[in-house]
């Protein structure tokens, strides 16, 4: 794997911090939420950022869907606090059954 530049390391640290905070909140507030993982392409940051909340079952996922917009807003607010503006918050956070390896 190619070594990350200083800018890419900062971007990764920023996203990891936000993802960890949101994951901790979500585990407390959303039953059935297993983990939070993310994917992004550094050369397209922040537009390529995709944060995923993984759920243990279809029932837990369906029960959590009404909360999706609230969590998208939380992600957007957390990124703004870090100095990153997400133009369309709905594109950057999804609820899924898939894990990072799927």
Regions found by a protein language model. Give the residues of each.
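Long, highly charged amphipathic alpha-helices
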Residues: 14-21, 70, 74-78
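N-terminal presequence-like segments and adjacent domain-start helices
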Residues: 1-21
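Extracytoplasmic glycan-interaction modules
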Residues: 2, 6, 29, 45
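N-terminal targeting leaders
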Residues: 16-17, 28, 58, 68
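Short edge beta-strands and adjacent turn/loop segments
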Residues: 30-56, 94
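Short secondary-structure junctions
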Residues: 23-35, 82-88
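A short amphipathic beta-strand at an alpha->beta junction
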Residues: 76-102
